[in-house]
């Protein structure tokens, strides 16, 4: 019975992990970007070996990016820098990420917007 029980336990844990990821990602979908960043951070720390880590890091980056570009001017620079750090985390984890094209386009906008603050 032990191998069967272990298999069932593994399957249930995989389902829970997927559900936690989908719940965290949902915050991004409904444009609750601060909540998405926290939930995705928690997901990555709670499930360090997850197969969803690449996607979690991308959605955290996307949330940080969306929060930054939609911010009031006073908060924009700080949030752009947070988004930049999220991009670097994604690329450090997986340089050839499946989200690379979009991530690079978003990063170019971040760099352009940050230049406005250094003038």
Residue ranges with predicted function:
Residues 1-119:
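Acidic, polar-rich low-complexity tracts and alpha-helical solenoid repeat scaffolds
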